[in-house]
A protein has these predicted regions:
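Short FAD-binding loop at a beta-strand-to-alpha-helix junction that anchors the flavin cofactor
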Residues: 1, 158-182
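A conserved FAD-binding loop/helix module that cradles the flavin
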Residues: 2-24, 175-194
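Generic recognition of stable, solvent-exposed alpha-helical segments in well-folded globular domains
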Residues: 13-16, 80, 116-126, 145-148, ...
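An anion/pyrophosphate-binding glycine-rich loop and adjacent beta-alpha core
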Residues: 20, 26-138, 186
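Histidine-centered active-site/metal-ligand motif
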Residues: 35-37, 143, 147-148, 177
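Short secondary-structure transition/capping segments
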Residues: 40-45, 148-149, 180
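FAD/FMN-dependent oxidoreductases across multiple families
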Residues: 55, 126-164
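Short, ordered coil/turn segments that flank beta-strands lining enzyme active or ligand-binding pockets
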Residues: 66-67, 157, 192
């Protein structure tokens, strides 16, 4: 939990691969760059960090603060949306429940405008059920969640590191997507590196 943020990662994700590679001389890059997924569950506390997909925002769900105001274009890059949510909370326009702070994903309005949307966004229904809410009646409280380390082991186009015989691919590598990856990075990794 970097800087107190909930995380979508399991507690066993401790960067052991990066440490091992670094100790034998591999170069690391951008290890100070982390991505915060904008729509992680904030309430109830035992689900903090569970992710709600971008598909929910791309379907038309709006983010609203504690005053009921929309405050960001939800389809902006993750870092822009996450920063806007943090600003609303920091400036006192967030929502507080059981000590958790966040904003609302306005699911009631989405479902009222498109009653069949939950048939397409099945995971939204599952997450709402776990939260103990009916998303057609009550909005989901969300907050940015620590999701991904953008940095990692530096590789070339053949997946080779600067250490002879050490090849790396996948989430242990850094720099392929820059400092602010988009969703679906695993697809690019598989297509590019097999």
């Amino acid at each position: 939990h970097l800087q107190g943020f909930a995380t979508s990662n399991h507690y066993g994700a401790t960067a052991d691969g990066l440490v091992m590679a670094y100790r034998i001389g591999a170069k690391l890059r951008d290890v100070d760059s982390f991505q915060y997924h904008p729509t992680g569950v904030a309430h109830p506390p035992h689900l903090a960090g569970a992710l709600i997909s971008e598909a929910v925002r791309s379907a038309g769900t709006k983010l609203v603060n504690g005053l009921g105001e929309r405050f960001v274009d939800e389809l902006q890059p993750r870092d822009v949306v996450a920063a806007a949510i943090l600003r609303e909370c920091r400036e006192g326009r967030g929502v507080v429940r059981d000590g958790q702070v966040g904003v609302f994903l306005d699911t009631p309005r989405l479902i009222a405008n498109d009653p069949d949307v939950l048939n397409r966004l099945v995971t939204l229904g599952h997450v709402a059920h776990k939260c103990g809410i009916d998303p057609a009646v009550e909005p989901v409280m969300i907050h940015p969640t620590l999701h991904y380390q953008n940095g990692g082991i530096e590789i070339n186009g053949d997946s080779a590191t600067c250490v002879e015989g050490l090849y790396c691919a996948g989430e242990v590598t850094g720099g392929i997507h820059g400092r602010n990856r988009l969703m679906g990075n695993a697809l690019l990794d598989i297509i590019s590196f097999g």
